[in-house]
Amino acid sequence: MVNSLRLGDDDLVPVDYTDLLDKILGVLQSQNPFSRSSDNYRLVIDIDAIANEVSQLQIIPPLGSFERQAHSATVNFPAEVEVRFRSQIRQIREYLRQHLETILGGDDAVERFVASLIVPLDSTYFRGGGTELGFKYNFPRHSTLEKKKLTLQRLDSSTRAILKLHKLTISVRNSDIFQQQLREGLKKYINENTDNKEDRENLTDRLDEIVQDESSNFHKLIRLVDKETLGKLNKEAKITYLEYLLENIRSNSTDRVGIIYLQDLIRRLRLIEEYISDIDKSDGDYEVNYAGVRVNYRDIFSRAEVLDILPIVPIVAGYLGESTDTHRSERKFIFGLKIKFDNPVQARGGDDVFEYNLNLLNPDSDEQKTELAEDFNREKFVRKVLKIALLYYFVFASRSNPLANDYNPESEGNYQPRESFESVVMPVLSGSDEERKQQILRGIIRGLNQYNIKVKIDRLKQLLKGFLDRETILPPRTESRHINIKRGILEQIDDTLTTGKFFNDILERNPKQALQYITVENARVNPRAICQLPVNITIEDIRYFPTDERQSFSMEYNIKGINALPVLLTPRGAISKDTYAKHFNTKLVVFRYENQRLKSDGGLPPAEAFVYKFTMLLLSYMCLKILAENWGKNLFIPMVRLHEGDHNNPSPSEKFMAHLSKTLSHLLSEKYRCNSQGFRIKHPPKKFTIGNGLSSLYSILPKKFRFDNVQLSPELDNLAIIVVSSRESDARKGNANRFQRKASLIGEIVGINRQEDGSIQVEMLKTFSENYSVTHLYTQPSILEDAMSQLYEQGYRNFAYISQAPYTSTLHITKTDEDEDLFFMSKSLIRTLKGERRDIKIYPIFFDKYFVRSFEQHRGESFYIQDIMELSNLADDPNQESVMFFNLFNGIKVDQQGDKNFYNGVISYSTLLHIYQGILDDKDIHQDLIYDGLTKDTLLHYLTIFHFSRYEARQNISLKLDPYERIIGDDSVGALSIFSHTGGSANFNSLAFLNKVRELDNEVDNNDW
């Protein structure tokens, strides 16, 4: 059988799982995955054996020959494939149901047996101390919880600050007239380079044509500047921040050597910019190649993130606001700053950043050999290797050894890395002798080790940390810069006269490569620039001070009426077998699997691994749905995972099962409640580890809060929190049009309700996920529309609608529909949520995390900050678009090897102002989120207790810093649901796929809450 996939008009790669599903059906016909224990206490499900057998069969790849054209491909079914898919899924479900009935004795027996496994959570069956592996827990009441208020204002001169934030503000002027300036710059170029009136008139007419044509390269350049320049400004801000620190350290430190190292780091970073921007060099002078992959250094080092692989480098982290001043034609972007301190990299079992990247650079390392052997990842890896080679050479190459007896730190400033790089390294990397290239890379590593560069890095780290720990408040600093569009992006005037093209072909082929012609430089007139935008970069030292305001409250579980169906995911290894026998001899559903299937050495090859994972996720989901189908929202499915691997040497199979359990938990929580938690058992886990794990497992259960002397707004007796995110499921490589993609809308709804006894209950109402074209994702997603209707029917009138910050990447130069940049905060989507319901309030809120340095230890303490950082003129400024109104901080530092715990995270909440005229009442947003008052206090109180409700520790309870991590971020269900297709070059979104499967289950009843 050969699939007959053809590319359609939607510019997406089609998928066809027909053959794979047929193979699953074939194996499933003859194998029953279900068995039960002799005491009838456990249902054992062996999907692993079926998945492994299916993986050994010859299967037509779901993407046919088109995989390399797809960035992701999951649910873009041709019509005829869709029909077969629905039939096959129903057939698989029927086979599973029949197998289950076979071992249990008929249809009614399935329901009876499942009922025998389900136990009320408040029964003695689940009661225990919470210190032993298993499901027993004491569901403790916490009666002495407290939150404390911090403020930006020092109450008196003796008050010591608790937190330090370094704030970055980037102010861009004239962005609203950039198109006009670009046109004038091109007209000036025409006038300077044409000899006669006729040529000038012809080219001016041609210029007018491309200005009018929205699809022209003129507008492509404008869009490129709009979307990519803020990243380049952030890159410049990183170096400016180092200069800011150096300026203040010089007058406050006696560490002469450390100061020299910081000064030299800045010098070398500037040398890279000078080298890449050298006007006397052509693009070809930067061409290098390695392992068959060609790279242009000018292109690579024009990217915003290029410095981030350094061991010590500032990081722009955390979105703090954004505003527009139309009178001054100025737009401000506000961020947090922190420094990366050569932290350990988990992927290498604790190697720090410097050693990790040297290992990638090393031609003899296992990592480089493995990556170069895999075609699908080779280009990306080689780009990284060549980037490390230049960056580490320019920043660290030296002839001065800090451990030598005659070492003179001043000599560091005399070394010129550019000269030796151009004379020694570039001729080799631009040539064709692969052996010499490997020798050069080995030589770079040898030199960095021989001259003990790590000693210098550690000294610099010590200097910066010591300075950042000081309590002296630093004065602000503002630096002026220009964004320059260089003439190098233009064709020669004679060629333009012949072809009518003003711009280099690079803008047509790959716009991002044209970033090399967009530079950020010191503020001065540049005759080689087509046009310039003025920019200010401001760095400020912000402090948070304690106050006497605090609130006390208690928290307890409300598990009455909740029934539990425990599930265990366990490897077949000896350690797991012993743990299972000792701690899990109880009522539960058991999924057993072989944890060696996916190991890199001797495990399944990539194509077979995809088939195995696909089969595991499909059948495990369908099995659990069959077991739970007759139970309502009061069913809780706690999943416990046993892991024989450890943090430094995790099992790939166990990691996959962890990700799978998160995906299953999200899907099942649409109708029930489900959560998963893993326990590492290579060594017997400690009691507090078990307690924290069980607390995490049960963190989504309803909780009731009681307060002392807290006044709440009578208008806010309830609040629904709706959290949304998305994850791409289908997209073509090289297609920059994000509207020609498909994605999964992912979310969660939490209800906060005031009870008759005066307590406040917080509970997860449901999760949701559904697939959409991106065109509809941010405008009229029906799943959100339905959720709002259902919440309204349940009595909710106040809605905190939360997503991650949408305003972080563009200068907003283009005059396109502003909804494109608002994503989940688009006016179209907010209008959909509002509908015709005039008696509801929707608060558009987005959150982010920024980082601060804490001067004290605050274990188990919780703080809130509700000062408005950018308060000036807020009431009178109709152009203010985004303002941060609330911050939460818990003082907890992560105990782990290295220095990742130097900073503390702070969660920020921001809202959008003057965006939704005619849809939402802007007065509500001002009065309820911005200005102090009872309504604002109540809303922020509700948000705070939601953070407390998601705590994942058994003792020293404080608010959970990021309660949205299941929906948004690197550890979200959307991120964890991704794995590679058979060829390894395209992504498969398992959540999006199961959404498609779930559609069949929900056809009869998709409104059951």
Q: Language model features by range: what are they?
A:
Residues 2-477, 481-487, 501, 505-510, ...:
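Long, contiguous domain-sized segments
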